[in-house]
Amino acid sequence: MNKALKIKRGLCSIVCSLSVVVPSAFASMERPHYVGTDEPFAEKAVYFVVTDRFVDGDPSNNYEDQGGEYPTFNRPVLSESGKAVANIGYMGGDFAGIVKNAGYIAEMGFSAVWGTPIIDNPDQAFSGGLAIGEGFPTDKFKTGYHGYWGVNFYKLDEHLPSEGLQFAEFTSALDEYGLDFVLDIVGNHGSPSFDMPRDQPKFGEIYGADGNRIADHLNRSPDEISAAEAESGFFHNFPDIGQLSNFNENSPIVVEYLLNSYLYWLDQGADAIRIDTIKHVPNHFWKTITDGIRASYPDMFFFAEHWSHDAEAIAQHTKPENGGISVLDFPGQKAMQSVFGLDDQPMSDLLAYLHLEDGIYENPYELMTFYDNHDMSRMNAKDAGFINAHNWLFTSRGIPVVYYGSETGFRRGQGEHAGNRDYYGQDKVDWGVNHPIRRALIDIAQVRKRSVALQRGVQINDTFSTDTASFIRAYQDESVSELALVMLNKSAEARSVSLTVPHSCNYKEALTGREMTIERGGWSQRLEPNSVAVWLCSSPFAL
């Protein structure tokens, strides 16, 4: 992770390579540099799919008869009235469904797909654990449709590939659409491993690359594992998350197994890595893993899930001594749901999570920004709330992540076992092509895709009020200059938005193509309801 570069309005902090010079001198003197990050992955915007719940592109890999007395396909969760409110079985989504809709994803301005883990999971529903509810974890009769219950980290789950579309072919197919693939990895746990009425095949077991079993929890509670066995084996003898097996990260056997499995998939075309439940494993483990991967892939980008709204807690992972791993910006997620959801809190509430200058994060410009995901309730907002959230997400600092279906407001407000992870399907994709949320998302995401200032530039906040916000994104190195004036209005009425312009230039508004000379100093523009304006200047500048 690259160290953040700081800037303050009216002066250069450490981003400037020399004292500020007047624009006319740029031809003969080195111009000041303004770089939020030089991380290549910062160019990306990420579309996140629970692969099984996106689109069924190949019904032949559904295995609808799998599981025997604990079937795995289509297991609805029923309310007290008998209505299906969610599903905890496989629903058919696969690699073919993603490839079939790769153009749909790319059109929205995304350049990467993050899919849930691809590794083999058990072939039955889990018979232990607590009954399904909104608490965590409640896993009784749930299946591994989500991919996080790995039993063989070197084998694809059979529900994902198709003939001629194994993982290497899948990543190559995405490449043709300009889409990277983010590999979701787990280092904390395997599958549910105890509390079953009787032992079930694969649960609590680990298999090697050759298909042979190398570890088995034997349906024992962790405290039944001896200290000697825990020290030399695969599993700790204390629980962590529900009934999931708790990997012994201090064991060289575990480290070697996991590291080599991650490299196995990277060798087949995965482009970046998302780390699940990072806070459940000590930092030294992830330093070993990231060092091991970067020995072969020195530019590999990692980001991790540490579910906490405390910036200092999640920032630890971004430090070089802990692996230099970016994180999903959970403090930002909480703020965005509050501001753009039905609570409709003021835009000024967004400022606190940015941490542009206080040094909490190694580099705040490399954080993954999002407003909801598969583990929490989807954002409960009107269409305008989603539009405004995307306008902010794709112009402010960080790398945007959007959860599948959000482009149509899919299952808004619903939690994990209340519809959050429902099957989307080809019919919904086709129906939503011209949805107003999606059309507005395309507009602003394509602007970011073309703008180095929005991708990598420093952010200088100007005016944030109840319904409006204005700020500057600035990027300049020895060969490229781009200054972006960003203005947002989340009100249902037109609003005048003010901004202090740092540089006189002939600006071009990125969404409309309108051109205007804007002089340095105070300036305001009247914005339509629920809208954004991004004025771009490509001449050299000094702030």
Specify the residue positions occupied by each region the protein language model found.
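Bacterial N-terminal signal peptides that target proteins for export
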Residues: 3-14
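Boundary at the C-terminal end of the N-terminal hydrophobic targeting segment
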Residues: 25-27
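Active-site-proximal helices and loops of the catalytic beta/alpha 8
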Residues: 29-30, 171-173, 178, 189, ...
